[in-house]
């Protein structure tokens, strides 16, 4: 059945409206991405300073043959904790699918029995996905802002660290998409606890020798190490949000480009149908005139 000219015109108008919406959403995502990238950059400055301070402290700590902090010491792994970061909604391309696919593969390979891991979810997509497959998150956070403050995520971070300290699990990982650029992200599963990426050998020897402490190193580490773990988890959340905004921008750009192609194809279809209708009318007029002669 041939499509009428009015139907094609309505489809063109509808697609143009959709294109305007996706284009506006793309611009909003681009603005969010710029702010997220700035927040991530500022966090890296802070994190590098905290890391340097800790490596310097740990260098002296090691030199004094003192016992390492529990947050630095591995223990037999009976249960593993995961913080899984997804978005609250769709319209972000393959952003969520990448993380959730990796989680299913990880569960199948390392936790086939299903009773030796716990999941904490940031983002409704991940939480709903887990529940649909019979995995109950021990904690979930929804409605996170595009540039989340630490106060927004403090509860879930503190919950994860508290569970580790109470030995409800023996290691903690964060699963998220790392932002590379506006077109690319990398799925990462990074160990947060016990802390394994602080190397005392990277310490500044001159700084360490001249370091004067009012409290003991143990007391300072008791304060700094949990804060460092908190900051690393928070950094992963900022990174994931940046990747989410980039994915949203790219998805809306793709949708806008696709809409333009659909409009172009429909316009060609409309012109052909209109030309056929005009040709048919001319043919009928000529035939009618011939019949009157």
UniProtKB/Swiss-Prot annotation:
Instruction: Return one Gene Ontology term, BP aspect.
Output: proton motive force-driven plasma membrane ATP synthesis
GO CC terms for this protein?
plasma membrane; proton-transporting ATP synthase complex
Keyword Transport among UniProt keywords: yes
The record's comment on protein family reads: Belongs to the ATPase gamma chain family.
- Fetch the HAMAP family from UniProt: ATP_synth_gamma_bact
The job of this chain, per UniProt, is described as: Produces ATP from ADP in the presence of a proton gradient across the membrane. The gamma chain is believed to be important in regulating ATPase activity and the flow of protons through the CF(0) complex.
Q: What is this protein called?
A: ATP synthase gamma chain
Q: What is the lineage of its organism?
A: Bacteria, Bacillati, Bacillota, Bacilli, Lactobacillales
């Amino acid at each position: 059945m041939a499509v009428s000219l009015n139907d094609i015109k309505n489809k063109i108008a509808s697609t143009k409206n959709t294109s305007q919406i996706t284009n506006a959403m793309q611009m909003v995502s681009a603005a969010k991405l710029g702010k997220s990238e700035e927040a991530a950059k500022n966090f890296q400055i802070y994190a590098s300073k905290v890391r340097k301070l800790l490596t310097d402290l740990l260098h002296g700590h090691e030199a004094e043959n003192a016992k390492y902090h529990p947050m630095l010491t591995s223990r037999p792994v009976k249960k593993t904790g995961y913080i899984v970061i997804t978005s609250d909604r769709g319209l972000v391309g393959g952003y969520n699918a990448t993380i959730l696919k990796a989680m299913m593969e990880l569960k199948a390979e390392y936790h086939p029995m299903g009773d030796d891991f716990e999941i904490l979810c940031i983002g409704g997509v991940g939480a709903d996905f887990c529940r649909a497959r019979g995995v109950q998150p021990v904690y979930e956070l929804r409605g996170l802002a595009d540039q989340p403050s630490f106060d927004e995520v403090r509860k879930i971070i503190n919950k994860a660290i508290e569970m580790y300290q109470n030995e409800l699990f023996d290691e903690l990982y964060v699963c998220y998409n790392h932002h590379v650029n506006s077109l690319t992200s990398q799925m990462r599963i990074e160990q947060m606890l016990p802390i394994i990426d602080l190397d005392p050998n990277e310490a500044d020897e001159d700084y360490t020798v001249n370091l004067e402490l009012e409290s003991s190193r143990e007391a300072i580490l008791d304060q700094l190490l949990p804060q460092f773990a908190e900051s690393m988890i928070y950094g992963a959340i900022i990174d994931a949000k940046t990747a989410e905004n980039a994915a949203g921008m790219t998805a809306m750009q793709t949708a806008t480009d696709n809409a333009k192609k659909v409009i172009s194809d429909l316009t060609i279809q409309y012109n052909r149908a209109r030309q056929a209708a005009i040709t048919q009318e001319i043919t009928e007029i000529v035939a009618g005139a011939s019949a009157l002669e």
